[in-house]
């Protein structure tokens, strides 16, 4: 089973259609949002290997894992492999991430769980002050996405990380805004 993120449905069908007949392989997939689980079946181990290689080459970075690897676990592994720390600019983003990362092994090495950012008694208010100052003339009710970006930028600078995230809460959904470098 391969796990993909952001792979368009049409490309999945086209990639499976390119399986060589001698592989005697087929694939089924199920998507939820932008995440797709793709199961490959073949009559032989060689056919399975070639079909999986074909899919990996077709989708490249869209493939984030295989088997039971969750998107959260893949993100933690990637951050750890690149020696990166992810900081949060606000409690809403912290709550969204904590619920997904708290049981992932190694998450504490790559995510601050708010201890160095929004939840810190000194740093949290600094993040908010810097974010509001950046938006300056937008008044008491700035656009939620612009405010989230400003919070992520402020958290990244104040905490000293290359990656920071903040949450824009809208009427119908939540948007996580990631600021890189």
Tell me the role of every PLM-derived stretch.
Residues 47-181:
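Short alpha-helical segments enriched in small residues
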Residues 1-51:
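An accessory alpha-helical subdomain
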């Amino acid at each position: 089973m391969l796990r993909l993120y952001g792979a368009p449905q049409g490309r999945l069908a086209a990639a499976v259609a390119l399986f060589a007949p001698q592989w005697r392989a087929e694939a089924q997939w199920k998507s939820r949002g932008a995440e797709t689980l793709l199961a490959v079946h073949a009559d032989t181990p060689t056919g399975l290997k070639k079909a999986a290689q074909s899919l990996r080459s077709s989708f490249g970075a869209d493939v984030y894992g295989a088997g039971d690897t969750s998107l959260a676990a893949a993100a933690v592994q990637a951050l750890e492999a690149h020696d990166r720390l992810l900081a949060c600019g606000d409690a809403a983003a912290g709550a969204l991430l904590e619920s997904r990362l708290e049981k992932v092994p190694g998450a504490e090495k790559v995510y601050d769980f708010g201890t160095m950012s929004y939840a810190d008694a000194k740093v949290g208010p600094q993040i908010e002050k810097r974010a509001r100052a950046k938006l300056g003339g937008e008044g008491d009710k700035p656009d939620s996405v612009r405010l989230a970006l400003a919070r992520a930028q402020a958290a990244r600078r104040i905490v000293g990380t290359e990656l920071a995230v903040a949450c824009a809460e809208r009427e119908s959904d939540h948007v996580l805004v990631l600021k890189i470098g």
